[in-house]
Amino acid sequence: MSRKPIIAGNWKMNKNPQEAKAFVEAVASKLPSTDLVDVAVAAPAVDLVTTIESAKDSVLKVAAQNCYFENTGAFTGETSPKVLAEMGADYVVIGHSERRDYFHETDEDINKKAKAIFANGLTPIVCCGESLETYEAGKAVEFVGAQVSAALAGLSAEQVASLVLAYEPIWAIGTGKSATQDDAQNMCKAVRDVVAADFGQEVADKVRVQYGGSVKPENVKDYMACPDVDGALVGGASLEADSFLALLDFLN
């Protein structure tokens, strides 16, 4: 079945509010119709108000880069999914390898966050991916499959069909190494197969799976040609308006 592509830029810990506003103003009027593709940027928490406000009359959607699994309470430094929804965010990225690695997030944390995000009417972009060691040991499919199953446990079939999964091999994030087209296709298909096993083929046919890891305007077309790759989660190439817009040339 045909799934609408989704290109999401992850700014990570970059841009101040003025830079975020300038970026949105530079890209907003040049984006293709939402009939063709969903386009989003994941802004740091300190930029979300400005980014959402700047994007509100355009087709650009806005993601938070993380949230907590409780709506309110004594959780110093955390971001409420309820408030993200009230602010007008569309998506929340969860389970990024940087969060898992540097901030010790577990599969259980990510699962709780996914449930909290849905409870507040937002859509999770759930990241998964393996280290170079796991990849070279030939255990990538098994490892990533376990991450996906754990992240989605207890969600409804309808919820899973509507979310976004982002496969990002850790060895390809910001390293300049990118997975081959075959790697990306095989792993994104493996992710979809896990969804099929856990929730049925109909759900697996609907869920969108992104590839992430050194995606650039020069290679995005190759990845987007893969039958099981429905989009890209893009880091470095999403920081400049021109390179971000160039990522959408795969539509032509």
Curated annotation (Swiss-Prot):
Cell compartment(s), UniProt: Cytoplasm
A Pfam family: TIM
Q: Does the keyword Cytoplasm apply?
A: yes
User: What are the annotated GO cellular component locations?
Assistant: cytosol
Keywords, A to Z? Cytoplasm, Gluconeogenesis, Glycolysis, Isomerase
The active site is formed by: 96 (electrophile), 168 (proton acceptor)
Pathway listed: Carbohydrate biosynthesis; gluconeogenesis; Carbohydrate degradation; glycolysis; D-glyceraldehyde 3-phosphate from glycerone phosphate: step 1/1
- InterPro entries (UniProt xref): Aldolase_TIM, TIM_sf, TrioseP_Isoase_bac/euk, Triosephosphate_isomerase, Triosephosphate_isomerase_AS
GO molecular function (one): triose-phosphate isomerase activity
Q: Which reaction does it catalyse?
A: D-glyceraldehyde 3-phosphate = dihydroxyacetone phosphate
Enzyme Commission number, as recorded: 5.3.1.1
Q: Which GO terms describe its biological process?
A: gluconeogenesis; glyceraldehyde-3-phosphate biosynthetic process; glycerol catabolic process; glycolytic process
State where substrate binds. 10-12, 174, 214, 235-236
Where is it mostly found?
cytoplasm
Q: How does it assemble?
A: Homodimer.
**What's the stated role of this polypeptide?**
Involved in the gluconeogenesis. Catalyzes stereospecifically the conversion of dihydroxyacetone phosphate (DHAP) to D-glyceraldehyde-3-phosphate (G3P).
Family, similarity comment: Belongs to the triosephosphate isomerase family.
Query: Could you identify this protein by its name?
Result: Triosephosphate isomerase
The lineage is:
Bacteria, Bacillati, Bacillota, Bacilli, Lactobacillales
